[in-house]
Regions:
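Active-site recognition of the HExxH zinc-binding catalytic motif
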Residues: 95-108
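Pan-zinc metallopeptidase signature
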Residues: 158-209
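Soluble non-cytosolic domains of exported or imported proteins
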Residues: 88-92, 96, 112-117
Length: 209
C-alpha cells in the first residue's frame, strides 16, 4: 500500500470515527469530529493536499504539515498544502498522521484560532489515538506535553465511556496546562505561532485553504 493510501486508511478508519471533542477559544469553542479529518481525506484524493516523505525536518520534528511552501536545504521546494510523514503503518505513526491532518484541516477550513491552541488540540488528537489503539504509554507519553495531552484525553475518554450526549469539552484545567506546556517547549517556544506568541498574542498559522 502506498504512503498516500495508508494515510487515507487512517483518516477514514475506525479510530478517527470515534474522535470528537470541543475546546475553548475566546468566548466560543472549536469542534473536532470525524468530519474534520474527512475534509483532509477528500483533499488528498483530489490532489489539493499532497503526502510526501520528509528529507530535512528539524531535529525533534517527526512530521510536518506545510501550510505555505518551504525551501529544503538543497534548494528544492516543498509545495504548500504538503503533509510530510515517514510512515502510517504503526500505531504511533498513525497517531502522528492524525496530528498533522488536524493542522491540514484547520488550513483547508480556514479556521480562526491561535497557533498554540492549534498545536495543543493536535496533541489531544494524538493522545486520543494512542489511547484508543492501546499503545503502551511509555511509548508515547514520555515528555511534559505528552503527559498533559494524556490527561486531557483521559477527561474526554471518561465522558465517552459514560455515554455523555453531544460532543464533550476538554477539561479546562487540563487544557490550559497543556497549552502552557506547548508554549514553553523548546520546539515551539519562540519558533512561531505554536509557542508563546500564539498563547499570549494570538499569532496564527496560515489558514488560506
Amino acid at each position: 500500500m502506498t504512503l498516500k493510501n495508508q494515510v487515507l486508511s487512517v483518516l477514514e478508519g475506525p479510530v478517527i470515527a470515534r474522535i470528537r471533542f470541543r475546546f475553548p477559544i475566546a468566548a466560543s469553542h472549536v469542534t473536532i469530529a470525524p468530519q474534520t479529518f474527512h475534509v483532509v481525506a477528500r483533499a488528498i484524493r483530489s490532489g489539493r493536499v499532497l503526502v510526501r516523505v520528509p528529507t530535512d525536518l528539524a531535529t525533534g520534528v517527526a512530521a510536518q504539515y506545510n501550510d505555505v511552501a518551504r525551501t529544503r536545504l538543497n534548494g528544492t521546494v516543498v509545495q504548500a498544502n504538503t503533509m510530510e510523514v515517514n510512515a502510517a503503518s504503526g500505531r504511533l505513526d498513525q497517531a502522528t498522521v492524525a496530528h498533522e491532518s488536524l493542522h491540514a484541516a484547520y488550513d483547508l477550513l480556514r479556521t480562526g484560532l491561535d497557533g498554540n491552541a492549534e498545536e495543543a488540540s493536535a496533541y489531544v488528537v494524538t493522545a486520543l489515538y494512542c489511547r484508543m489503539t492501546g499503545l503502551p504509554r511509555p511509548t508515547w507519553a514520555n515528555g511534559l506535553i505528552w503527559a498533559q495531552a494524556a490527561l486531557a484525553a483521559q477527561t474526554l475518554l471518561a465522558q465517552y465511556q459514560r455515554g455523555s450526549s453531544g460532543i464533550p469539552m476538554v477539561g479546562n484545567d487540563e487544557w490550559m496546562t497543556l497549552r502552557q506546556s506547548v508554549a514553553l517547549h523548546p520546539v515551539y517556544r519562540f519558533a512561531g505561532p505554536g509557542g508563546v506568541f500564539g498563547l499570549l498574542a494570538g499569532s496564527q498559522y496560515t489558514h488560506d485553504g
